[in-house]
């Protein structure tokens, strides 16, 4: 029986990534102090819920249009489900970081055809400081990056096809729209 190296045994890729996801984005998530950007975003979502105005985001009664609405709506839904729960707000950003890394893994696999390369690249992405910081705090940038990675992945799939695949174009457009 020939022994397959660990990195080429593809059934271990997803469990290994899941383990790194848990360590990077979810374990001991409440230990980091809330920064000013995180606080502003959560206050905006909280006002959206308490004022029952889901279309016009405000902070302290003033319009706040600097950030895209989708992450604010996600934070507002979390606020409805569990008010003042910062670890749950951060877990949503962690899920977006997981989505980013999984789309990156799929994209690297399609681009190179080498799943070991995709695993190593995804592990490097998942353990980079900026991605860990965005995935562990309730800021909006990780959502933009995750949805845009999905758009890039589906656009790449579309452009590699010989025939026009409208569902892939639509998926790329939807993910691109969600990132803004």
Where are these regions (language model features)?
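Membrane-integral, polyisoprenol-dependent glycosyltransferases
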Residues: 1-180
